[in-house]
Amino acid sequence: QPLLAGSSLTSLDIEVAEGHYTEENMKSTVVPNRNMILLSVATGHALSIKAGQIAYAAHSGDHAIYPDCRNEFAEAMANAIMLADWEQIELIRPFVDWTKADIVRRGAELGVPFAKTWSCYKGGDLHCGRCGTCIERREAFDLAKVIDPTPYADDAPSVASLRAKEWRL
C-alpha cells in the first residue's frame, strides 16, 4: 500500500473532486497528517540551516475540511517545534485567520507574481478551473477585485457562472 494512501492527492486511483469545497466532496483531498509531517520536515531543515523561523500558510477557509489547518493545531505545533530541539524555531502563521480574498488583496499590494503560483489539485499543464482549490482561487480574486492572471483549461467554467451558483467565501 502506498505511503499516505486514501487521498485523491496521493493515490492515482482516487479522482480529485470537482466543485466548491463541501465537507463530503472534499474529504477525498485530506492527506493523513500532512501538515504535521511537512512542518516537521521544515523544522528539521530550519535547524540545519540555522533559520529562526518557519512559515505556515494555512488560512481560515481550510479549517472546516482540514483539521491540521485549525489555529489549535498551529498553536500545538508551535509549542512542539519550540520543544523539539535546543535551538528555538518560531512557527509564523500570518494567514490563519485570513480568507483567501484577504490574502489575494495583500498579495496584490505586495506585487506577488500570481501567475507564477499554483493552486490546482489536478496537476495538469493549466489550472483545471473545476476543482475546489481552483474555484476558491477564482472566487478569491473576484471578491478581492484583483485580476486573476491564471491560465485555466479551455473547458473551465466562466467566473460569471461560478459566481451565480458556487461562491461561498
Feature roles, as predicted:
Residues K27-S28, A84-I89, D125, P149-P151, ...:
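Short C-terminal domain-edge/linker segments immediately following a structured domain
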Residues I49, A115, G129:
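Structured loop/turn residues at beta-strand edges in well-structured enzyme cores
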Residues F95-Y121, V159-W167:
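Short, charged low-complexity linear segments at domain edges
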Residues I54, Y121-H127, V146-D154:
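Charge-dense, low-complexity polyampholytic segments
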Residues Q1-G111:
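ATP-dependent adenylation/nucleotidyltransferase module used to activate substrates
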Residues S40, W118-E139:
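Local cysteine-cluster metal-coordination motifs and their immediate loop/turn environment
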Residues G19-E24, A78-M82, K116-S119, L143-V146, ...:
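Glycine-rich loops and low-complexity Gly/Arg-rich segments
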Residues I135-R137, F141-L169:
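Short Fe-S-cluster ligation motifs
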